[in-house]
């Protein structure tokens, strides 16, 4: 069994869960963005007095106009001072961990064989949740690398997201996956595209080099940006089947 975490602008999908079930996996698809699901299910995500979503375009109960990129306090943040808990990512990782707990309690699930995977922003959620000791394997898709505050090699000044963070050292120590990968004990399959803008090869391999073990793989299609092909879906199925 595993948790699936969708990407930015996306939603939980029944057909995707059916596909995974046909491969032999119980799964939960967390609808963190709060978009209405295609099946017109009335009961949907309600974040209450916090809002780690991408704004009212997707989430009807959004408290902000868009994605919160920094750790600064605002009227909807948890802490009144700069804090990791003011980051959307912390809330989304907490949602991921609650999804693990949900799977653990289902009668169809072997609680000793649970994994985590997700696409793009879901890959980032995967990276931040991968330290959970209950996980036996993880597979971030096109997202989840560290070092987003570092410019790309070759002197490409301004190619990082450093200006967004304001509290850079706090971000590096508590939010960037650079702080998480050294503590991930389970096997990792990093699935990406050769031309991906969100999980570039240099950041992937630099991140995987932080792992305290050698049980990791990288799978990429060629000449494509931010999407995966049938070979990568096969990698996910085989990875989860093994662990």
In which residue ranges do the predicted regions lie?
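Cap/lid segment of the alpha/beta-hydrolase catalytic domain
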Residues: 8, 12-94, 145-159
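Catalytic cores of secreted or luminal carbohydrate-active enzymes
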Residues: 197, 201-243
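Short beta-strand/loop motif that positions the catalytic acidic residue
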Residues: 184, 190-192
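Charged catalytic carboxylate motif
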Residues: 95-98, 235
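Proline-centered loop/turn at the N-terminus of a beta-strand
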Residues: 26, 113-115, 137, 187, ...
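Active-site nucleophile elbow and catalytic-triad environment of alpha/beta-hydrolase enzymes
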Residues: 166-180
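Short beta-strand element of the alpha/beta-hydrolase
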Residues: 1-7
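Primarily recognizes the serine-hydrolase "nucleophile elbow" in alpha/beta-hydrolase
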Residues: 97-169
